[in-house]
Amino acid sequence: MAEHLKIIAIEKETHDVLHITTEKPENIKYHAGQAADISINKPKWENELRAFTFTSLPTDKQLEFTIKTYPQHNGVTNQLLTLKTGDTLLLHGVFGTIAYKGEGLFIAGGAGITPFIAIFKQLERDGKVGDNKLLFANKTHADIIQEKRYKALLGKNFINILSEEKLEGFEYG
């Protein structure tokens, strides 16, 4: 049976990415990097499951999801744009094997950064960011999720590549 997740807040992270915060059921268990099958608790959408990564930590008092939207597709992520505080998502199950296995280079493109959001939060909380590096590819500067946070956290170890925009201070390709 699906867990009901009441939405506490919805914020725009970028022009096409939402940050959704929900209440957290007591029995939910997951680790940084894992995802959940989520649907929207509205007629015709309850069985439209999509995988979204937890961007909160297991010890947080709420759940957070950072989700790229695709309004032109008229699908689940477009429906997320219609939600408001008090609406409900349905959590159908937790899965995934992405986990921190030691210092190294994290490589992400666009919304593919979401498993690393929670992993870097955990490393920061534990004081173990170390010499980890993040190579983050996006189409444009406006697409970069949590840019200020990663600049502050990683400094020179936060490397950005833009594929559709040439800007000083960013790799291009």
Regions found by a protein language model. Give the residues of each.
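Ferredoxin-reductase
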Residues: 2-85, 138-140, 163-165
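FNR/FR-type flavoprotein reductase catalytic core
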Residues: 72-173
